[in-house]
Amino acid sequence: MLDLNNVSYSDDGPRDFELIPDGTVVRAFIKLSGGDHELPEFGGGTYFKSSQSGAKWMPIELTIVGGPYDKRKVWQNIFVDGAKTDQNGFSIAKRIGLETIKKMVDSHFALDMKDDSPEAAQKRGSINGVHMLNGMQICFKIGIEKGSNGYADKNKIKTILTPGSQEFIAGSPAAVAPAATPTPQAAPAPSAPATTATAGVTPTWAR
């Protein structure tokens, strides 16, 4: 029989963390969480789809490596499709999503965004699906997303950094995160406006 009266609380420090300050630069491992929708043009990987719009996204978990925020986590969504299109009829969400994914790959491989050398092309070309982001280590600047609908403020990716930025923190592209296989899990459909491809809520261009 369960007896909680004999269970002592361990003194592991506070359970609630203060938000990481806006503008903090960190490195973190990526862990993907798949959904139940496939997008062949993005290669391997599965996505969630909003029941209220054309938005599709993949949740990511970022575990910070090193520094005062070691092992802290940041959760966001990579939006990869939406109903709104540009003047050429191309999905705005898909374009921004592809740009975000490319920045993550460039950050992992320590490639300058303007590097179009054969070596850079070979490294980018080795990524044949979004699923390959799983376990990559990237550098990014922390931001703070204002909470809405009763949710508290939370940290988010403000900017993904590459060697072209003076704030870029170099790491080892050979570093491998602890083995983890993405598994589908429930995620609330985002509902409020945002401005980045990795925001926690549905951007207007992804609806």
Regions inferred by a protein language model and the residue ranges of each:
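Short beta-rich binding modules
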Residues: 1-207
